[in-house]
Amino acid sequence: MSSVPIRTNFSLKGSSKLVSEFFEYAVNSILFQRGIYPAEDFKVVRKYGLNMLVSVDEEVKTYIRKIVSQLHKWMFAKKIQKLILVITSKCSGEDLERWQFNVEMVDTADQFQNIGNKEDELRVQKEIQALIRQITATVTFLPQLEEQCTFNVLVYADKDSEVPTDWVDSDPRILRDAEQVQLRSFSTSMHKIDCQVAYRVNP
């Protein structure tokens, strides 16, 4: 009887790790594609069958990994709702883009159906590939960021979640006069992730 909760936790742990890791690569990809940091601040790594660009800047790496580490804990505890990356003008302080990743627990009667299933692993990888490619392709319709920008990451977690002491509350950072585009999604045996980007038409 003890094997059931062990398998459930393994499935949740594996899915939480996969989704948290995806966020790390997705954030890096957005920072590169949107020119938040110069191209020489990134290196190419192979992930999801794709050439991915990740920051080599120690401060950026530390910031992202700290968030991803906390995300993984909240994912495993089933307390995470969404992750948001906001791109802000350094000059005006105006928020210009808002990337939102919604996290939904998959409600399935058989949580063990796809555990260890190679075909399902390939399906998840293909879905992630498609989403990463779509994030890359957003440069074809997103307005060019003419000014220097910075970024912040917001995390929506349940109210009873234990929050790191150096994290602070934030407003939702909803963009005014914005267009919104729904991007692709991917799902594991435990989580479904969908993505959308909002951007200022006339910043």
Curated annotation (Swiss-Prot):
Signal peptide: none annotated. The keyword Nucleus applies. It comes from Schizosaccharomyces pombe (strain 972 / ATCC 24843) (Fission yeast). Interacts with mad3 and slp1. Feedback control that prevents cells with incompletely assembled spindles from leaving mitosis. It interacts with the anaphase promoting complex/cyclosome (APC/C) thereby inhibiting APC/C-dependent proteolysis, a step required for exit from mitosis. One of its GO terms (cellular component) is nucleoplasm. Disruption phenotype: Simultaneous disruption of nucleoporin alm1 results in a growth defect. InterPro entries: HORMA_dom, HORMA_dom_sf, Mad2-like. One of its GO terms (biological process) is meiosis I spindle assembly checkpoint signaling. The lineage of its organism: Eukaryota, Fungi, Dikarya, Ascomycota, Taphrinomycotina. Its main location: nucleus. GO terms for molecular function: anaphase-promoting complex binding. PANTHER family: MITOTIC SPINDLE ASSEMBLY CHECKPOINT PROTEIN MAD2, MITOTIC SPINDLE ASSEMBLY CHECKPOINT PROTEIN MAD2A. Residues 13-197 form the HORMA domain. Belongs to the MAD2 family. Coiled coil: none annotated. Keywords: Cell cycle, Cell division, Mitosis, Nucleus. The gene is mad2. Pfam families: HORMA. This is Mitotic spindle checkpoint component mad2. It is found in: Nucleus. The keyword Nucleus applies.
